[in-house]
C-alpha cells in the first residue's frame, strides 16, 4: 500500500513537472506560479505532499492548490486553475468540454461512489435479485417512486442513472432532488429522501453516521476514474509528454 501510494505520488509529480518544464526553466526568479484545482480526494494528497516537501520550488514552480467541493464547482471555476482533477462526468457535461485536455488518469473510484440508505431501508432486504448484478441490493419496486438526493452534473448523477438502469428504471420513475453533497447529506440526516448518491469523502461521512451502501459504481458496472486535466490553451504550447487525448474526442 505504501509503495503504491509513493509510486503514484512520484509518477504524478513527474507528469506535472514534465508539463511545466519549459515554463519553470524560464521563470527561475521568482518561481512560476502554477494555479491548480482539486477536490478533497486522494489525488489531492499527492500534490499537497509534494508541495509540503518543497519539490515544486526545487523545479522553479510555486504550485497553488485551489480547493473545490465538487467537480461541477471545479469546472465552473475553470478560470481559477490551469491543471486540475475530477471525475469524467463533470467535464463531459460542462458547456465547453473542448476547453480541457486530459493529461492522465488517476484513481478508480468505483467503490467510493455509492448509493446510500438508512439502516431500515427496504432496499437492504434483498440482494442479487437483479440478474447480472449479484452485489446490488433491492428490487425495482423498492426504488420506484422514491425520492433520491443527488448532486447534479457529478459522478453521483452518472451512478444514479446506471443504478436505475440496473432495475429497468429511468429518472422518470423516481423523484430526484438535486442538492450538493454537504447540504444533501444534512437533509438526509434530518429525514429527507429515501436514498442519497455520494462520492468520497462524503460517502465516508455517510458511513460514519451509520448509512448503508445499497450500490456502488462497481456493483452496477459503472467505472468511475479520476481524470487529470489541463486547460487546452495552457497545455497546447507546452512541449511535454504526449497527452492522453482531448475531451473533444473519445475519453475514459
Q: What name fits each language-model region?
A:
Residues 183-252:
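Pocket-lining segment of extracytoplasmic ligand-binding domains
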